[in-house]
Amino acid sequence: MNKTLITLLLVAGSLVGAHAQIKLFNGKDLTGWKVAGTEKWYVEKGEMICESGPDKAYGYLVSEREFKNFELTVEFKQESNGNSGVFFHCGIEGTTISGWQAEVAPLNHHTGGVYESYGRGWLIQPTADKEKVLKEGEWNTMVVRVVGDEVNTFLNGVQMITLKDEKIGASTGKIALQIHDGGGVKVRWRKVEIKAL
């Protein structure tokens, strides 16, 4: 084999690896994540579960790795009050989180919309007709795609929003799953995968 062919194979292999789907949840434990707050995060029967604890406060499960441009796919099922979210480009100090959240909430509460934590608040919400895409009490698939300053979210194959925002484009950070304060929250997650773009 000549040197040119070997070089091409090595470059091709590194490009494939750079864009491979990475499982952020291994189905067994919380390896690769850090718990922030006193709320409950545990694994049961291959599912990652967040549940309100006695403090009924905000809680987060934060990735150890940071991501800039990516496509994140999560599967979730809400039980009880399913108010949660998927943060991206986030940083955290204690339980104070900065960054942006793709909303995961009960029906007609803007699942798939984008909210800036401790900043400008709601940047965009899905239109009323798209609110019905959420399947309450069933498994849902959300895709969050961030490339530069553009964010797209999809719920069960339906595009929920498109947003362009310079502040997002200039940032990077971790992925975090949220449990909302107030108590009575329980959400199950069974697929959390990311592909760098």
Regions picked out by a protein language model, each given a short descriptive name:
Residues 1-5:
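Positively charged n-region of N-terminal signal peptides that target proteins for export
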Residues 19-197:
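Carbohydrate-interacting regions of secretory-pathway proteins
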Residues 9-18:
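Hydrophobic h-region of N-terminal signal peptides that target proteins for export
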